[in-house]
A protein has these predicted regions:
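C-terminal outer-membrane/trafficking sorting elements
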Residues: 220-227, 232-289
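Short, conserved sequence motifs used for protein processing/export or organelle targeting and
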Residues: 1-214
Length: 289
């Protein structure tokens, strides 16, 4: 939507099996944080604390998301099993139905395989056109998931930085909570609870990335713009054209008009690195015809 910040996140499974795999307590979740240039948090999905676990994760089970638009929505990759009544359970002997399974499949995974009924996706992931399908052709077997974070552009920031982290957690506290209710009646459970609560249960970082984004152009603005106007450490420089004008040639020059470097139009529109350029005032010369 016009005026929204929008980021597409793609995860690719590099393992030869579903991720996370093995015992169904294991989860992976995406932490997405949007900050202004001063480091102030503007949006945060998937934050984790020792006291609450994954903030925003639903009490029963979190839906599989294709688009996230609020902080109480978080993408959690997991398998959720249900008992004969359809209620989620952590007791394997009571498992009767598959409520959710959006764990990332390995590359080449096919729903047409003869054994698919034993390793099938949950219903929500199966309906996601971006889950295990390539962006170009829509063919399955990509071993990936693509999702969108859409955030209203009412944050009073022309430049933002997005931090995306994939976390892995082997045993969330809620998985063992029902077992701990029996600690007074079981010395073994009480002993395990003591060890569990004293252990470092910080999620493992699987992958992380950071990117900058800038407020889009106004179709009615007749002027070329650069974003940001003042470059901070590590920030790329982006050329924003008026309307749908496409540059043919882009040159970065210094205050004396000397050429610092030529930039391809594609790189100029996406944002290019200037970290190796000395501090000072610079201009961009653009040719459109």
């Amino acid at each position: 939507e016009m005026g929204d910040w929008e980021f597409e996140v793609e995860l690719r499974n590099l393992a030869g099996h579903k991720f996370p795999s093995g015992y169904p307590s294991r989860i992976a979740f995406i932490e997405f944080e949007l900050q202004d240039p001063d480091g102030n948090t503007l949006f945060h999905s998937g934050e984790w604390t020792p006291e609450t676990g994954v903030i925003g994760r639903d009490e029963t089970w979190e839906p599989h998301w294709e688009t996230i638009e609020s902080e109480d929505q978080v993408q959690v990759y997991e398998m959720v099993i249900g008992d004969v009544t359809g209620a989620p359970t952590q007791v394997l002997e009571r498992a009767s139905v598959l409520i959710k399974d959006n764990r990332l499949p390995p590359r080449g995974f096919s729903t047409n395989h003869a054994a698919y009924d034993t390793v099938q996706f949950g219903p929500m992931a199966a309906l996601d056109a971006n889950f295990n399908r390539t962006a170009q052709t829509g063919e399955e077997g990509s071993g990936s998931d693509r999702m969108t974070y859409r955030i209203p552009n009412d944050l009073n920031a022309a430049t933002v930085q997005a931090h995306v982290t994939l976390h892995y957690l082997s045993v969330p506290a809620r998985w063992v909570q029902s077992m701990f209710e029996w600690a007074e009646d079981s010395e073994e459970i009480a002993s395990f609870q003591s060890m569990f609560e004293s252990a470092d249960r910080t999620p493992v970082v699987v992958a992380t990335t950071t990117t900058w984004a800038y407020r889009g152009f106004d179709q009615n603005d007749p002027e070329w713009r650069l974003a940001p106007s003042a470059i901070g450490s590590g920030q790329p420089l982006r050329l924003i054209p008026p309307g749908e004008t496409i540059p043919l040639e882009v040159v970065l020059v210094d205050a004396l008009g000397r050429t610092v470097r030529s930039v391809t139009p594609d790189a100029a529109l996406r944002g290019f690195d200037v970290s190796d350029v000395a501090s000072g005032a610079f201009f961009v010369r653009v040719r459109t015809e």
